[in-house]
Swiss-Prot record, chain A:
Its main location: cytoplasm. Subunit of malonate decarboxylase, it is an acyl carrier protein to which acetyl and malonyl thioester residues are bound via a 2'-(5''-phosphoribosyl)-3'-dephospho-CoA prosthetic group and turn over during the catalytic mechanism. Transmembrane segments: none annotated. InterPro entries: Mal_deCO2ase/Cit_lyase_ACP (IPR023439), Malonate_deCO2ase_dsu (IPR009662). This is Malonate decarboxylase acyl carrier protein. Covalently binds the prosthetic group of malonate decarboxylase. The modification O-(phosphoribosyl dephospho-coenzyme A)serine is found at residue 32. Keywords: Cytoplasm, Phosphoprotein. It is found in: Cytoplasm. HAMAP family: Malonate_deCO2ase_dsu. GO terms for cellular component: cytoplasm. Belongs to the MdcC family. Pfam families: ACP.
Curated annotation (Swiss-Prot), chain B:
Residues 2-257 form the CoA carboxyltransferase N-terminal domain. Its main location: cytoplasm. This is Malonyl-S-ACP:biotin-protein carboxyltransferase MADC. It comes from Malonomonas rubra. The keyword Transport does not apply.
UniProtKB/Swiss-Prot annotation, chain C:
This is Acetyl-S-ACP:malonate ACP transferase. The gene is madA. InterPro entries: MadA, NagB/RpiA_transferase-like. Its EC number is 2.3.1.187. Alpha subunit of the biotin-independent and biotin-dependent malonate decarboxylase multienzyme complex (EC 4.1.1.88 and EC 7.2.4.4, respectively). Acts as an acyl-carrier protein (ACP) transferase component. This first step in malonate decarboxylation involves the exchange of an acetyl thioester residue bound to the activated ACP subunit for a malonyl thioester residue. Has a weak activity with acetyl-CoA as substrate. It comes from Malonomonas rubra. Coiled coil: none annotated.
Length: 112, 318, 554
């Protein structure tokens, strides 16, 4: 990402990862204090890759902790995640990502 | 996102652009153009350290209502106020153009193509107009959209839906006014200069933007319905907007043309009559206009439920 | 030769002052508004203690303007004793040197200006109080010499109708008049006969019809459209883990979106939990518009109000079984009585705050704003004089582990004092901190104490999106701090939590996550709310609620 945005890359692996069902899934809106999540099924030997793009700097360690916790709770693997953030708080980050993963894990196909 | 059936009862006011786009057409028929996974986002925002969205705040695509191909444009007010920049503008232009091209192709193949199979465009507005971060590109997009709308005249009906938080203001107010049919909810707002800008330019005595009741009775759905700027008032659900849209699209193109506000000598004369009326009436408030339209106790209409309002409100005749 | 002692200096002085104003009256106690400034200049002396009525809701704004227009050569160094300083004119009075010293309770929008004036020496601070505390001092050492009050209606004899917004008026008028002080009222309307006598004419010396109705702030109106999913989640947690758990029937809700969410969850989630009739029956509470769905659904038996809320008048009048309605059919609020009810007769105070420190002390002050306290500390504390017993009070007392350290084996109840806060506010501003900003404010504004809204020893529960900390169950400060860390999420305070310790606290029921409470996070969204917009509230009230213009979006 060129310019002034902060780009972060993480890789996590949870203990008993399960693959997501949907090949790709989009969730959320980049409103103020909010974010969008893009999930893509991707062979990563059970790991999860996450790329975050955000105007916020100085909270990289918080991002790492929040994302690690959500991935570990969700027990998913083999998925590449992108997040476009606009000042979301950790609670919103965790909530949106968990919702996105839960939809992507469920067999019930949502509308798009 | 919720399932299509659940989306139908969702508040149109609270729905996201994508929810509105998916829910306005028949179940399972929506295909998005340049969606988030295509990652066509604004090249300008990162340079300014502003957050990006992979759809640039505009959902475009195609679906069906019955047999009719419906080209959908849906603006997302949560992302930079639904403002139109280079990418979101181009998506808007191209979507209308695709509808026009498809019409041309279908009709040249089959000149007697039934009305029910001819394409239409539906635009769900939620915007303050040009994105100031990329103003020139945004302005240019406005002009190109206008051009496409003109190009569709008498061929491809264009329906505007206005019932989202931000309303429809700025250059996009002009754009909406140039479409064939406008459907609003009572929570929708339509205007050119936004309330805050009027206050800034003309002073608080002229227009107090913090007086939301004033803002709504000047730009809101009920007022626009009474004065004829909007053709239909829908309830605040995706279902109601979809059903109203469906009903309008069952009408032949010639009839849809009659809903327009501008675009013919006759329409211009009607508008001039309205200007004359405003000069002679010198309204101090929209309530004066409502009263002139024949509503004896106009204030009582403000808090009425939609059904009561539709049953009682008298509309202005030029 | 011994001089005879004089015992009526105050009334003699008052008579002299009133005589000086004689020609300004047009009829009995009526003074035309153009004589407002002259009246104040006639009856006020430099150095007087003056009450200017105004709280977080109604404002005697015309009389404030008059005072601000007085000649500071004649009238200066006043000592203002007033509930609140929320209007720019309140500070102008100090800027012009008309007033010097201030004793108050609530800063509101002028909080930053108060801090600035303190630093610059334009304002000398007596103390920051709670409402009830300040009222108490009107009858002790801060009795006003002249009080400037406001009412809806007044008559020629000085009788006042303060109605829905009675608020602080009775306390001010009584304290002032019964120590021979002077009471001047601005009224929205001069009438032949007031609708109801809220303040007897004998207590009032002058009535002025103000050019504009007095200003009213709709401070307690929360637009349901702005309630977030997280607030819904925390509301569900509070309802199940606290309201339901303790069977809280008598309570106060603070201002804010958390409690607005709870109010709107009663008819939905509350019914689902089967709590109707078991919780939320009696309130000391302003007429919150977000209470309408719960009232209509039959949850509430009574509400006594500190003040009125703009737009709720007709609704309250149409529900006389719930609200306190006079023989004339209109409501009467009374801040002093409602605060007393809130202090002595409620089993729970629940509200939001800005910052909570690692010990559990909380404050709404920031380094540059003297926000004041309002009424929250009177309710957000354990009423030490309370002796009557209710089930929830007893239950919380029985849990209160640290009580035995001072009381031995003597049982005692405890009020539930609950703070709700997301771990981060907007822009990644943490709510849990090592040290409150209030410390910096104390330094910046030369305060003797850091202003604390609720002290840790009164706090029994914290609700965040991470979970509920049941602090009353903790043994000692160390354990309380661990429980606080356990719900402080990804703030520095939260990140210092020891996961093993938090796990032990969860096993002991001292920390409960939404999962521990059996709450499905995926259900925690706005669809749970009984009303999602102000229009929904209007419809739910059958058109009786008339929201202020700024809340209308149709």
């Amino acid at each position: 990402m060129e310019g002034m945005l902060n780009e972060l890359n993480f890789k996590f692996k949870s203990e008993n990862p399960v693959d997501v069902v949907l090949p790709k899934h989009h969730y959320g809106v980049v409103g103020s204090g909010d974010l969008e999540v893009l999930l893509k099924k991707h062979e990563l030997e059970g790991a999860v890759e996450i790329r975050v793009v955000s105007p916020v700097r100085g909270f990289d360690h918080v991002w790492e902790k929040v994302l690690e916790k959500v991935i570990s709770d969700a027990e998913v693997g083999n998925v590449a995640i992108e997040i476009n953030d606009n000042n979301a708080t950790p609670v919103v980050v965790a909530l949106r990502l968990a919702q996105a993963l839960s939809e992507a894990k469920s067999a019930e196909q949502s509308v798009n | 996102m919720a399932k299509w059936t659940e989306l139908q009862d969702k508040s149109f006011l609270e729905a996201t652009a994508r929810e509105r786009a998916v829910g306005i057409v028949d179940e399972g028929t929506f295909t998005e153009f340049c969606g988030p996974f295509d990652k066509i986002y604004s090249p300008h925002l990162p340079l300014m350290g502003e957050a990006i969205e992979y759809d640039d705040g505009l959902v475009a695509g195609v679906g069906k209502i019955g047999k009719k191909p419906i080209f959908v444009i849906s603006q997302e007010g949560r992302f930079i106020g639904g403002s139109i920049g280079e990418v979101s503008g181009a998506k808007m232009v191209k979507t209308i153009q695709l509808a026009s091209d498809l019409y041309e192709e279908m009709v040249s193949e089959k000149p007697d193509l039934p009305e029910e199979m001819r394409p239409a465009v539906v635009i769900s507005f939620e915007t303050g107009g040009v994105r100031l971060h990329e103003a020139n590109a945004g302005l240019l997009a406005h002009a190109e959209v206008m051009d496409q709308i003109q190009n569709c005249r008498g061929r491809v009906p264009i329906i505007s839906l206005i019932g989202s938080r931000v309303g429809c203001f700025g250059g996009m107010g002009f754009v909406a006014a140039a479409t064939d049919v406008i459907i609003m909810s009572q929570f929708g707002r339509l205007g050119l200069t936004g309330p805050e800008v009027i206050e800034q330019e003309m002073g608080k005595d002229e227009f107090d933007a913090s007086d939301r009741a004033l803002v709504y009775r000047t730009t809101g759905g009920k007022h626009k319905y009474i004065i004829g700027d909007c053709n239909y008032l829908a309830a605040d659900s995706i279902r109601s907007f979809r059903e109203t849209t469906t009903a309008v699209l069952q009408k032949p193109m010639e009839e849809i043309e009659t809903f327009r506000r501008i675009g013919s000598m006759e329409k211009i004369k009607e508008q001039i009559e309205l200007v004359k009326l405003s000069v002679s009436l010198k309204p101090k408030d929209s309530m004066d206009v409502w009263a002139h339209a024949g509503n004896e106790n106009p204030e009582s209409l403000i808090n009425m439920t939609l059904d009561e309002f539709l049953a009682q409100a008298k509309r202005l005749k030029a | 030769m011994q001089k005879e002692k004089v015992w009526d200096k105050l009334s003699t002085d008052t008579e002299e002052r009133m005589n000086a104003a004689n020609e300004l009256f047009s009829d009995r106690k009526v003074v035309p508004s153009q004589n407002g400034v002259a009246l104040l200049e006639a009856v006020i002396r430099a150095g007087d203690r003056i009450n200017l009525e105004g709280n977080n809701q109604k404002q005697a704004d015309f009389l404030a303007e008059c005072l601000g227009s007085c000649d500071s050569e004649k009238i200066n160094n006043l000592h203002m004793v007033q509930s609140a300083v929320p209007l720019p004119i309140h500070l102008d009075i100090f800027d012009k040197g008309i007033a010097k010293k201030l004793d108050f309770a609530y800063g509101g929008p002028m909080a930053a200006k108060v801090a600035e004036f303190l630093r610059e020496g334009k304002l000398e601070l007596g103390a920051i109080h709670t409402y009830l505390e300040l009222f108490a001092r009107y009858f002790m050492d801060l009795t006003p010499r002249v009080s400037l009050i406001c009412a809806y209606e007044g008559d020629k004899d000085g009788n006042l109708y303060t109605g829905f917004n009675t608020e602080d008026t009775p306390v001010i008028a009584e304290a002032t008049k019964f120590r021979q002080g002077i009471v001047i009222a601005q009224v929205n309307k001069l009438v032949d006969k007031v609708q109801r006598v809220d303040i007897p004419g004998e207590w009032v010396d002058a009535v002025i019809e103000s050019p504009k109705p007095f200003y009213l702030e709709p401070l307690f109106t929360r637009d349901p459209a702005n309630i977030t999913d997280t607030q819904v989640l925390m509301g569900m947690m509070a309802l199940k883990g606290i309201y339901g758990e303790y069977g809280v029937q008598r309570l106060n809700h603070g201002i804010g979106f958390f409690t607005a969410a709870i109010e709107l969850l009663l008819p939905t989630y509350g019914n689902e939990l089967g709590l109707k009739g078991k919780i939320c029956k009696h309130f000391a509470l302003n007429p919150h518009p977000t209470m309408i769905p719960a009232i209509e659904d039959g949850w509430v038996e009574s509400i006594h109000s500190f003040g009125g809320e703009l737009g709720m008048q007709k609704y309250c009048e149409a529900r006389p079984d719930i609200f306190f309605i006079g023989p004339d059919g209109s409501m009467r609020s009374n801040r002093a009585y409602s605060q007393t009810a809130g202090h002595y007769a409620t089993d729970m105070f629940i509200g939001g705050t800005l910052q909570i420190d690692k010990y559990g002390n909380s404050s709404t002050a920031t380094a540059s704003r003297v926000a004041g306290f309002g009424g929250a500390p009177n309710m957000g504390c354990d009423a030490k004089g309370r002796r009557h017993v209710t089930d929830s009070w007893l239950k919380c007392g029985a849990e209160f582990e640290d009580q035995a350290a001072l009381l031995g084996d003597m049982p005692r109840g405890k009020r539930l004092v609950v703070q709700m806060q997301e771990t981060f506010k907007e822009k990644m501003d943490p709510s849990f901190v090592e040290k409150l900003d209030a410390w910096n404010l104390a330094k910046n504004a030369n305060l003797d104490l850091a202003p604390v809204m609720i002290y840790s020893d009164d706090l029994t529960h914290i609700v965040t999106e991470e979970g509920i900390a049941y602090l009353a169950k903790c043994r000692g400060l160390e354990e309380r701090m661990a429980a606080i860390r356990g719900v402080a999420g990804y703030t520095e305070v939260g990140l210092s939590a020891d996961p093993k310790e938090t796990k032990t606290l969860r096993e002991r029921g001292i920390v409960k996550t939404p999962e521990d409470l059996g709450i499905d996070r995926s259900r925690a969204n706005r669809s749970m709310l009984a009303a999602k917009s102000v229009k929904d509230l209007v419809d739910c009230s059958g058109g009786l609620y008339e929201p202020p213009a700024r809340f209308v979006n149709w």
